[in-house]
Amino acid sequence: MAESCNKKHPVLAVVGPTATGKTALGVTLAETFGGEVISADSMQLYKGLDVGTAKVTPDETHGIPHHAVDLLTPDEPFSVADFVALAGRLEADISARGRLPILVGGTGLYVQSFLYGVRFAAEKTPDGLREQLAAELAEKGPEAMYKELQEADPEAAAAIHPNNQVRVLRALEHFRATGKRLSEQKAQSLPPERPYRSLVLGLDFPERAQLYRRIDLRVDKMLDAGLLDEAKLVYDHRQTYRTAAQAIGYKEFFPFFEGTAALEECADKLKQASRNYAKRQLTWFRHMDGVVWLDASAPDAAARAIRLTREFLAKG
């Protein structure tokens, strides 16, 4: 369990790859412990992008408040720093009302930045740069981003572990924004402790094939629920919906709208892209400090999560 005494407020987090049941577990824990959910999904912030982002439905919330959802139009930029500030305000408000803040989502950069209290640069960051870097990370994976940093700033890369994607992106952001190497200045280090006393629960399946089957089934259900209509909306506004246009779940159908690929082919590409994304999510969270992993397929997964949370809260 990852804990810190910087703040007495307990914060719970439910993380893991796509299609592992994070939303349902978050609701169960909120019902059990009087909590409210803070979404840690970079795409669920956007209005109108519901099916492709697997956004929680009103029925699925069971009346539990869900925050950081449907806040922006798809043409509005939103950075990691924006999320950290937003989540901090939400955490303070939820805790002040005697409720338990529960961070739920698979955007590892959001979760890690919030829980670890990453400091962001004081320099002016060009509009869209952080969103672009986050999209590149999702598309290319952490190894490619680290390789780019090695080429741009070998000294900074040598001082950063390849799996510390937060600092890798910070260094790349500085280089792209200023044209200067971060190693040329005094690097801003991460705070030594997390700003919240936290328990991080991770969901995964023991057999990778289980996860892949769930992902394939989810894509099929999304198509039945109207994913193609959402993808067409993003395609039609791709010049302004730049973040959404790079998101998994929408861009895979652009060839279909352009008449260069069949729908089934695009759906298969989405399934493969989702599987690849799940692998990158696992890589991220497996290297994140303090995650307590649960077998998502186990009948007692929710019961174990409740027990761990109860023990965590009792230590407060």
Where are these regions (language model features)?
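Phosphate/pyrophosphate-binding catalytic cores of soluble transferases and nucleic-acid-acting enzymes
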Residues: M1-G316
